[in-house]
Curated annotation (Swiss-Prot):
Domain of life of the native organism: Bacteria
SMART domains: PCRF
Annotated Gene3D superfamilies: 3.30.160.20, 3.30.70.1660, 6.10.140.1950
Encoding gene (name): prfA
Organism of provenance: Granulibacter bethesdensis (strain ATCC BAA-1260 / CGDNIH1)
Name of the protein this chain belongs to: Peptide chain release factor 1
Amino acid sequence: MSFTANLDRIVARAEELRASLSEGLNGDSFAAASRELAELEPVVARIEELWAAERGLAEAEAMLADPDMRELAESEAEILREKLPSLTREIRIALLPKDEADERSAILEIRPAAGGDEASLFAAQLFSMYQRYAEIRGWRFEILEYDDTGLGGLKGGMAEITGRSVFARLKYESGVHRVQRVPATESQGRIHTSTVTVAVLPEAEDVDVQVDEGDLRIDVYRASGAGGQHVNKTESAVRITHLPSGIVVAMQEEKSQHKNRAKAMKILKARLYEQQRAALHASRAADRRAQVGTGDRSERIRTYNFPQGRVSDHRINLTLYKIDRVMLGELDDFVDALTAEDQAARLSAQEL
């Protein structure tokens, strides 16, 4: 279908939905039509703006033959010629296939990789950075796991981030994050390099993943704290093993075994859902390990250089000299640039 024909189809569909809603629909049909129309209306507004610009350009060009109107017509035509390509591009981007998971909430997982104690300290800082970003965006941030080192570091942490388009905004954060700085314990002033892995998984819904209880091995045990000492006299900690996939999820944050099991199942479903998505979309990692890499220092998506006060995203060659603001959760500059880069790449691929 040509671009022009596709625009006609979209506008016609929006008119059809408006007519159906005005005539009255019941229950699920009304809700479905309302959702579809809400998605189409911003695109239709841009299409109508494009058509108005095209009509205006045609009228201005027709006026060029009139000596009295030529100067005004040339000025108007120039403005509209400059406007048309950007409008067309905006519409093409809006019509790109959407990731079904973009509107969903997400599971965030952070683990120190290379660098020992310094990696653990930076993992804790990244966890706080994303928590602050969630606050800025108005999202709910619930800690599912926070295994601290006892020295301000983080052995591993997970959080459920709930809100609209959480996955769409955070999915580009998956990968290896590298930090370069002088540790507090470094007497010679040498810069150390450490890495932390970040994984962002779209939250699974019950319709996405069906888990057979017979495929699960569930172990319960007493929760332990820093240093390995038991902090709970009851067996409240839960470890769930999904036998077909080999995925293991352990949870001990809650004092209730029931709550720990519910959280562990939520994480398990998110990981199974991501595996399904990976199988369906060859461009994505085959599993979570591929998503975050090995944690080796040479594999990185972003570098945080504290001595220079800069943060560099290596995928889009964007460097910002405001590391303090970034660590306080001001990530939108990176997220917006990564989103634009992804849209441009998909648009180019579509036009080939």
